[in-house]
Amino acid sequence: MLCLAGAAFISCVGTAPTKEVHLVDSLNQVAYTYRYKNLDSSYHAASKAYQEVGLYSQGKAEACNNLGFCAFMRMDFEEAEKYYQTVYNLTKNELELLVADIGLMKIYQRTALNKEFYDYRNSALRRMKRIAED
């Protein structure tokens, strides 16, 4: 009996609690909903989602994409780049990575970093192809 309990405990290590997932997902949804309506509200919700993450790295990646968008809209390209780059260390989710690719493309287009723009454009195209295959 002790072995089974130990095995069950080990299999759950690293899994985000349901309550955390629901909270972070709802905050990210609010951030996304307000992105073109009220940028401050979008930023506040995304920032709260980022802070509330314990184990839910997927939710943190989405929060980073939302924070990157807010920073981009404020024309704080360095901050936006930092958030988008963070996504690559948090998740393997192709959709979140695609959002980060496109966010970085927008930054590099605006800042005339053409090589970087095309690097992330090619990454986004490959990612879209993989997503379409799935």
Q: What do these predicted ranges mean?
A:
Residues F9-D134:
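A "functional boundary" signal
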Residues M1-A8:
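Bacterial N-terminal signal peptides
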